[in-house]
Swiss-Prot record:
Pathway(s) annotated for this protein in UniProt: Cofactor biosynthesis; coenzyme A biosynthesis; CoA from (R)-pantothenate: step 1/5
CC cofactor note: A monovalent cation. Ammonium or potassium.
Subcellular location field: Cytoplasm
Residues reported in the UniProt entry to bind substrate: G113, A114, D115, R116, T190
GN (gene name): coaX
Top-tier EC class: transferase
Residues involved in ATP binding: N6, V7, N8, N9, T10, N11, T12, L13, T138
Organism: Acidobacterium capsulatum (strain ATCC 51196 / DSM 11244 / BCRC 80197 / JCM 7670 / NBRC 15755 / NCIMB 13165 / 161)
Official protein name in the record: Type III pantothenate kinase
Length: 272
């Protein structure tokens, strides 16, 4: 089996795929979303992942390879230790210097996060291009992949939860509120007012950026949502036509397949 970890600032998404002898992957066996904690130890990760696998009737010993995309550098060493201690292989970290097969046509390609690279690879494989991926996470990322399958840039905005926490932290009389679609547009109490402003304000931000990106691209564009808040927000967008919650994971799986094929071609096959 192939274990995939997408480590973000707020949540970590974990997935397990079937892995065949030739290095190909297909069936997504299970996914889990856990909180990201920088103080977590390698053994805590090991105990947690072992328990998650057991809940699906799976065991750590069946995991042949691990691929990781992390935007939390302080956790990288811990994750490496966790993988080497609980599995039989060193993890593959997707980051600068790792060939992904995705041309990155930006001013500073090494600055592009692994999750954004994976989003574009997954999107182009599934939908072709041009495609815009809106990733509703800690930040709301807009990742643009061209008709030729190139990452040509995008945008980064504060995520909805960050905006809500900023209001709570900086305005003494404003409470922390649940993120959900408001029942009406004119609020009659503070909680309603906050939910209306946060929810519809973020939808307005997303659609405003998408409208201008689509205009700049100049042709038909597919807009896809992923990330922890995609199911909450995407349905209200005028431009997002699909939610794909496993898009980043699928992109990481495809990078793994390309990496394994490259190693085998160059004589660096690690074996099963």
């Amino acid at each position: 089996m192939l274990l995939v970890l997408n480590v973000n600032n707020t949540n970590t998404l974990i997935a397990i795929y079937s892995l065949h002898a030739d290095g190909s992957t297909d069936e997504l066996r299970a996914t889990w979303r856990i909180s990201t904690r920088q103080g977590q130890t390698a053994d805590e990760y090991g105990i947690l992942v072992r328990s998650l696998l057991a809940s699906e009737g799976l065991v750590c010993e069946a995991v042949r390879d691990v691929v990781i995309a992390s935007v939390v550098p302080p956790l990288d060493w811990t994750l490496r230790q966790f993988c080497e201690r609980y599995f039989t292989s060193k993890p593959i970290f997707i980051g600068p210097g790792v060939k992904t097969g995705l041309p990155i046509l930006t001013d500073h390609p090494t600055e592009v996060g692994a999750d954004r690279v994976a989003n574009c690879i997954g999107a182009f494989h599934r939908y072709g291009g041009p495609t815009i991926v809106v990733d509703f996470g800690t930040a709301t990322n807009f990742d643009v992949v061209s008709r030729k399958g190139e990452f040509i840039g995008g945008a980064i905005a504060p995520g909805l939860n960050i905006s809500a926490e900023a209001l709570f932290a900086r305005a003494a009389r404003l409470p922390r509120v649940e993120i959900r679609k408001p029942a009406k547009m004119i609020g009659t109490n503070t909680v309603d007012n906050l939910q209306i402003g946060l929810f519809w304000g973020h939808i307005g931000l997303v659609d405003s950026i998408l409208e201008r990106m689509i205009s700049e691209l100049g042709h038909d564009v597919k807009c896809v949502a992923t990330g922890g808040l995609a199911q909450v927000l995407a349905g209200e967008s005028k431009y997002i036509t699909e939610v794909n919650e496993t898009l980043t994971l699928d992109g990481l799986r495809l990078v793994y397949e390309a990496q394994r094929a490259s190693r085998e071609k160059s004589g660096g096959n690690r074996g099963a």
